[in-house]
């Protein structure tokens, strides 16, 4: 039996805020962005999982840490809508968000909030079984803690599936054999 493609890693909420600039702020010489629209999408490992699911990879499962906040709930909805089955590890603190303020197609400012690197909770037995039955595994590390989780690393070292590792400078080295 062919198992799913399993993506493992840190997921962030990417938000693009589009607007128009018609004036400068009166108390400092910076543009004032009047928001017209915004769009949310998963970033990090979530983006890799969405790409795989929407490009015909078959069944795609994402093992990631999600905070119990509005950002985590939004990510869960976006991922499910894209056909990604989410296996969430508990994440203490807030969801990492990357907010880009844009006008006329150009980024004026990126505002990062939440999501300091934290150790996620332990994976369930279902997650460990998922990794064991995977047809392939992609680790998409964003340096925020999921790729450092000891039980996940042990499951990755034990799987017979091919494992690809997209490293991050702040993340750990790939498990031996990858």
Question: Model-predicted segments: where are they?
Answer:
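Ribokinase/PfkB-type carbohydrate-kinase core domain
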Residues: 1-22, 36-178
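Flexible glycine/proline-rich, aromatic-decorated loop/lid segments
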Residues: 24-27
């Amino acid at each position: 039996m062919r198992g799913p493609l399993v993506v493992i890693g840190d997921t962030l909420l990417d938000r693009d805020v589009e607007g128009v600039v018609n004036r400068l702020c009166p108390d400092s010489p910076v543009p004032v962005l009047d928001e017209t629209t915004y769009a949310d999408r998963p970033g990090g490992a979530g983006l890799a999982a969405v790409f795989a699911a929407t490009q015909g990879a078959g069944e795609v499962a994402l093992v990631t840490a999600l905070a119990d906040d509005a950002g985590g709930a939004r990510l869960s909805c976006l991922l499910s809508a894209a056909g990604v089955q989410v296996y969430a590890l508990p994440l203490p603190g807030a969801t990492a968000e990357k907010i880009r303020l844009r006008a006329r197609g150009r980024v004026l400012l990126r505002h990062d909030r939440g999501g300091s690197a934290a150790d996620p909770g332990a994976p369930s037995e279902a997650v460990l079984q998922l990794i064991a039955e995977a047809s392939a595994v992609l680790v998409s590390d964003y340096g925020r803690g999921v790729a450092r989780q000891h039980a996940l690393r042990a499951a990755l070292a034990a799987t017979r599936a091919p494992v690809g590792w997209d490293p991050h400078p702040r993340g750990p080295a790939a498990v031996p054999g990858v």
